[in-house]
Amino acid sequence: MNSIRTSVHDLRDEAVNLEEAVRSLVSDFTFCPVRFQYDAGRTVPRDVKYAFISISKEALSNIIRHSSATKASLTIREHPALYQLCIEDNGNMIRKNENGMGLAKMRDRVEKVGGNIHFFTENGFRILATIPKRRQDDETDTDR
């Protein structure tokens, strides 16, 4: 967990590579195996990167605190009109409050960048966040 906190502090760095940052969170996660898939380009807007890294950190933390999961997956995809983050686990329903503070923070972060987030509780727990792409002239931060 300390390395997860360190990764979040490193978010101040503008050259954060989304794939590497989330891969690091996943590799440091020892509660259960996590399958990580990344299918997004290297030109992801800075605010999208920060949102997805923060949500990934909170979701992995929630798996430890609220789940008896034996496996999880974390997928980041880029579609023609949006960026998508999906995190799911196969844990039992021991979550007491689907509207907890951590989930509220995730929702706030996604909504600040014009996106949506949904939580599903069938067959484990799933988080699906989508953030629409902006016009080409909007500021982006590439991972060089």
PLM ranges: what are they?
Residues 32-39, 84-86, 117-120:
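Conserved transmitter core of two-component histidine kinases
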Residues 135-144:
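C-terminal end segment of the histidine kinase catalytic
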Residues 71-81, 88:
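Short beta-strand/loop element within the Bergerat-fold HATPase_c
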Residues 12, 64-72, 95, 121:
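A short, flexible helix-to-loop-to-beta junction within the catalytic ATP-binding CA
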Residues 16-51, 56, 60, 64:
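Helix-loop-beta hinge of the Bergerat
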Residues 3-17, 39:
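Flexible helix-coil linker/loop segments in the cytosolic histidine kinase module
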Residues 129-135:
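C-terminal beta-strand of the catalytic ATP-binding
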Residues 96-128:
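ATP phosphate-binding glycine-rich loop and adjacent ATP-lid/helix-beta elements
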